[in-house]
Amino acid sequence: MAPKGKVGTKGKKQIHEENQDTLKFYSRIILGANAIYIAVNLLLFYNSSSFWTWFSLMFAVAVYVGSYRSMSAMAKPAFAEDGSLLDGGIDLNMEQGMAEHLKDVILLTAIVQVLSTLSSYFWYLWLLAPARALHLLWVNFLGPWFSADSQAAPEENEKNDKKQRRQERRQMRRF
């Protein structure tokens, strides 16, 4: 049974500690994926590495740097002059937040990067990121904007509502 009442809020100290743990976890994922990719593609199979091997590594590093820096900027705490914590930063573990999407991008890139040691075709899976971004853009912004009624529509809706009410009254009289 679900607990009744409001969900408890986190304190700024707890948010700060969880943010530090989250950043540490994702930095380990980034370092691990890069280590595996470099060990396999650039050390073990150095003779068969090409421009695309280096390009994909640079692409992954750029994605990692952008995502990780954004997350660390969001989680940056504010301290008072005496060293006490004023603000723990934005909660990186908050559901439906921007940090959730950044974490997904890091995980997708790490998975694709490690799988690409088996075949370069796994890089096509990275197309899931822009597809997800377009889906979110459509669902949250473009779809509602295109399906919104125009300014002239409320007048027509009032006329149609009046006609509908008249027809309902007539039907009620008949029965």
Swiss-Prot record:
Please give the residue ranges the record annotates as the region Disordered: 152-175
Q: What is this protein called?
A: Transmembrane protein 208
> Mind telling me which Pfam families this protein's record contains?
TMEM208_SND2
- Keywords assigned by UniProt, alphabetized: Autophagy, Endoplasmic reticulum, Membrane, Transmembrane, Transmembrane helix
Q: Where is the composition biased (Basic residues)?
A: 162-175
Where is it chiefly localized? endoplasmic reticulum
> Which species?
Danio rerio (Zebrafish)
- Cellular component terms (Gene Ontology): endoplasmic reticulum membrane; intracellular membrane-bounded organelle; vacuole
One biological process term in Gene Ontology: vacuolar protein processing
Q: Which family does it belong to?
A: Belongs to the TMEM208 family.
Cited function: May function as a negative regulator of endoplasmic reticulum-stress induced autophagy.
- Note the topology in the membrane: Multi-pass membrane protein
Q: Which residues cross the membrane?
A: 25-45, 51-68, 105-126
Q: Which PANTHER family match?
A: TRANSMEMBRANE PROTEIN 208 (PTHR13505:SF7)
Where in the cell?
Endoplasmic reticulum membrane
